[in-house]
Amino acid sequence: MSTDAFVAAFGREPDIGWRSPGRVNLIGEHTDYNDGFVLPLAIPREARVLAARRDDRVLRIVSARATDVAAEVDLDSLAPGSVDGWAAYVAGTAWALQGHGVDVPGADLLVDGDVPRGAGLSSSAALECAVAGALLHLAGVELPLAAIALLAQKAENDFVGVPCGVMDQFASTHGRAGHLLLLDTRSLEPRHIPFDLAAEGLTLVVIDTRAPHRLVDGEYAARRASCEQAAVLLGVPSLRDVTDLGSAMSMLDDDVLQSRVRHVVTENQRVLDVVALLEAGDVRGTGPLLTAS
């Protein structure tokens, strides 16, 4: 995204540019909101933000793919539900930063990117993290990467209203070229795992199935709610804490809840097994585990 587009939109040069990548998850599906383990990697598709500070308390948000202002919001009036559409992810990030004590300045923001929307590649998390980086720079504030990821998640959870886990934002802030990110979503401890497929003559292929993926459509929230319900019935803080799968199955009489518990418990172990194989140099040995995921 060139600065010419910013000048065309706002009549002046930007002060800063920021970008954050999307992600794919190698293994560890539906485990992040169960305090489990995930193994994503950043991809060479990203959200990009150009920003310039304003002298007032207004955020003007424009998409590089449109000519009109998507949203113009008063920073002192931000509240969940006050901004619609994709601009809510931008405004929500400013709102979350303010709640953390950051004096977010007014700003003109031009947003672009090449992370496909609705394809399960975390375009929203990439946008939130890029906006957070740009606004923090304008505010003259530095925060740890983990704090940025958590604030981006808060924006999506509490402002936009999507009950996502924290994997996507951590992958966007902590992604490293040539590595997977092993994240314990309970301790929030990240560990980079070398991932050199080319050395094995392999390629990771990401395929767009054309099946729409929307976290806001209710299905994701329902799945998360069923996992939380199962944890309550089993008397554990989260499904991460289930240690005896057979016993857990016998305590549940609902097929859906049994399926949720079985997946989370076995998926957490598969993540750890994949990491062990990769660290032992056995990339090809991960295949059966990925198939079982």
Regions found by a protein language model. Name each.
Residues 1-23, 27, 48, 52-83, ...:
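C-terminal nucleotide
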Residues 1-125, 129-145, 150-159, 164, ...:
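ATP-binding N-lobe of GHMP and related small-molecule kinases
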